[in-house]
Each structure stands twice: as structure tokens, then as C-alpha cells.
Amino acid sequence: VERAQVIQGTAWELDKTEVAFSPNPATGGESDNGFTFTQSLDFPTVYASRRNQLKAETQAEKSRLNVVSQQLKAEIANTYYQMLYQAHRLQILQRIDSVLERYSKIAEMRYKAGESRQLEYLSADRKCNENRLEMADVKSEIERLQIDLMTQLNTQEPIKPAEENLSAIAAQNLNSYNYQQSADGIYQQDKLIALDKEIKAAKSGFAPSLSLSLRTQCVISSWNPYNIDRSRFAEGNFFGFEIGVGIPLFYGSTKAKVKAAQKDRELAEIEMRQEQTEKERDFRLCTKRLQAASNRLKYYEQNNQAHSAQISKLSAIEYENGEISYVEYVNAIEETIAVLMKHADAINEYNQAVIAIQRLTGIM
């Protein structure tokens, strides 16, 4: 944007001023001896058209900056909520770790007391170790996401989620989508306006050019090889001016520039229509994705979340009392982990769907 604003200053660029010195020792103090200052310039409408084109291009760059800003915000939100999701998974695994550690100790005690086989103890120990390996993987993923977030925010300070628990993003005003009012649509429209101005600027090449020349006397009195009177005019040094008009008789190059600019405009319009179709399709897909994620989230929040906590608690008590076998207890633990993880997955999928729609609609 700053570069485009600076380039606006080139709209009124004039050609270089020509200075010619023409001494003629065969004449006296006449117009042959003097300086000539010549300035060529385009027709005034050329500068106006060029200025309008550069202003339109600056506006298009501002719109493009808004598109990039929306993309960056969406990437930051995506990374942030992915990190929050992984942190929530780590909390689940840490809670399960305490359960599995207790299960391993009980299995070891029962094995040493001769109340169970070694297979039960080995199975409990394996479950505990597998859970800790999963915890290590999740911690590594959190660190990776944290580095990504630091890069996106251009900071050296570690970023930690402000929320303690993973929760669904409040989805508001996500039911409709107007491409023309979105950041992408506004950018494409501004590009078309800039290309329209470019066509007008190219057509201004058919306008004539102007030139202005001023002459002033400059006699070198000491240089007189022919011994003639070379005295200066006593009344003054100004010898007159000359105004010229350049008529574009050969305008094939200008016609080619106009046609090229018109082709660029046609391609940009096709690109805008294609992008509009793609964005509207993406919105429909994201809406369906959000609805499916919402239904899945409601299911886990209304049913299985409470059931899994109850199953985990009852199975632990019954296993310690010897009322269920270790196989049944392992199944109960695995079911608890699966339900908690599926609930976390449902929240994450819902949040990602919301972020995708917010990116399209510009509500970030």
C-alpha cells in the first residue's frame, strides 16, 4: 500500500528539460547566438488519467491488504484453537494417566498376592506406558503449534491459551454470505475499477503532446573570428518563444496498449466470476460442515459425556472390589478415553468450521 501511494507521485512526471546552446560567429547579436530551453509535456488529460489509474491501484492494494489480513487472522485463530484442542487432549490423558497408574499398582499388588495372573499386571503396565507415549506426542504437537503461532504473530514470547478449557466458539451471523461485500469480492471489484482506469489511461495516448521553447541571447563577444559587430541587444536578452503540438499520426502502438488493457480487464472479470462461484460453493460446504459438527457436538454434550464419567468411576470401584475382571475394566477405561476424545474432536471440528465461515464472511 505504501509503495502504491508513493508511485502516485509519478502521475505528473514531465520529460527532461532540454537546454541547447548555439553560438554562430558568422552573425552578430542575433537569435543564432543564444540558449534555447525546451520542455515537452503530454496533454493535461493524460496526467489526469494516469493519476486516476494510480489512485485506483492504490485502493486495490488496500483491499488486497484487507484480504491478506483476513487470511492471517483465520490462520492465527485456526492455530490458536488447534493448540487449545491439543491442550485439552493433554488434560484428558493426564487424568487418565492417574487412573491407569492406580490400575497398574493394583494389578501389581494382586499379582504379587497371587490373586491374579501376570498377564493382568503386564496389560495394566502396557496401558499406562502407551498413555504416556500419547501424552508425549501431544506435548510435542502443542510445542509445534506454539512455534507456529509465535511466527504468525511475529513475536519471540511463548503464547499460551487464555482459556483453561476447550469450548465451542459462539457462532453469530453465519447464515448468509454476500460475495460482493466480502473482502475477496471488494478486492476483485477494486481490481476491475483499476483496470478500467488503466484502459482510459491507455486511450489518452491518442491525445496530442505539447512543447514549449524559450530562447534567450548569449553572445560570446571575445569570440569573433570574422571581425563583425557581435554586440548584444541593449533592450534585453529575450528572443521569443515557440509552442508546438505533437500529433500522433502513427498510433498502432497505442491501439495495441488499449487492446491489451481491455484483455486484462476481461480476464480479471472472468477471474472474479470464477472466484465468486468457488467462494459461494465453499460457503455452502462450510455451512453443511458446521451443521454436522453442531449435531455431533450436541450428541456428546447431552449424552456420552456424563455417561463416560459414571462408567469410569463405577468400573474403578468394582475392579478394586474384585467385582469385574481386568478385561472388563480395560474396556471401561478405553471407552472412557474414546468418549472424552470424541467429544474434544467434536468441539475442535465445530470450531474449525466456524473459523472457515468467518474467514469467508469477513467476521474475524
Segments from the language model and where they lie:
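Amphipathic alpha-helical coiled-coil segments
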Residues: 1-11, 68, 72-91, 109, ...
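Bacterial Sec-pathway N-terminal export signals of envelope proteins
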Residues: 1-17, 22, 41, 49, ...
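Outer-membrane beta-barrel channels and translocator barrels
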Residues: 14-16, 42-44, 73, 203, ...
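Small/polar, glycine/serine/threonine/aspartate-rich low-complexity segments that form flexible
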Residues: 16-53, 213-253
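Residue-level signature of outer-membrane beta-barrel architecture
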Residues: 39-41, 62, 87, 140, ...
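Short, charged, amphipathic alpha-helical segments
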Residues: 52-55, 118-127, 259, 326-334
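Periplasmic alpha-helical coiled-coil/stalk elements that build and connect Gram-negative outer-membrane
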Residues: 71-183, 286-289, 293, 336
